[in-house]
């Protein structure tokens, strides 16, 4: 009887050990299942990121973030500028430009400066009566055409005088005769007279126009 009970106890222990041994395997399997689920979640998150990049939603979210950041910075800048009073001054300048008052003020300043300089010039002497009368006379002569006539007469007289001197001090007769026949003498004379007249006319303009009386005395 005792042996039978002993055998039954051993069988019960064996059965108990048999049922208890799969428990760690179940725990390990549950952990592996959780790990697999976590990996699946990570993979799904990565797939979502890839899809967002491919669909442009990631870039859109990044742009929204940058826009919101710029908006915050701009609001902060406005608050700081308003405190310092710089914004009101800038708005005033912009309004003046838009209304044209800024340009008008600049024009008015330049006009006042020009008027002041002109008054100072008049006070410090200005044009003398002799200069004014001489200018008026020159204007009248230009209008009547006498100024151009005097210039033409002066050039003709100087050219004639220079041509006579050139003939007196010119080349030998034989050379002049042959050149007359070829026509080169006339061309050279024309060129010389034109150059001489132009040179003397420039000098006449620089040194002042001689009077007609002086020209007559020279001849």
UniProtKB/Swiss-Prot annotation:
Entries under InterPro entries matching the protein: Glucagon, Glucagon_GIP_secretin_VIP
CC per GO annotation: extracellular space
GO biological process terms held by the UniProt record: adenylate cyclase-modulating G protein-coupled receptor signaling pathway; negative regulation of apoptotic process; positive regulation of insulin secretion involved in cellular response to glucose stimulus; protein kinase A signaling
Localisation: Secreted
SMART domains: GLUCA
Major subcellular location class: secreted
Region (Disordered): 23-43
Keywords: Cleavage on pair of basic residues, Hormone, Secreted, Signal
Signal peptide: 1-20
Record's keyword annotation contains Ribosomal protein: no
Covalent S-S links between cysteines: none
Highest taxon of source: Eukaryota
GO molecular function: glucagon receptor binding; hormone activity
Record propeptide residues: 21-50, 84-95, 136-140, 175-178, 213-219
Pfam family, one: Hormone_2
PANTHER family linked: GLUCAGON, PRO-GLUCAGON
Annotated function: Promotes hydrolysis of glycogen and lipids, and raises the blood sugar level.
Family the UniProt entry places it in: Belongs to the glucagon family.
Protein name: Glucagon-2
Gene source species: Xenopus laevis (African clawed frog)
Gene: gcg2
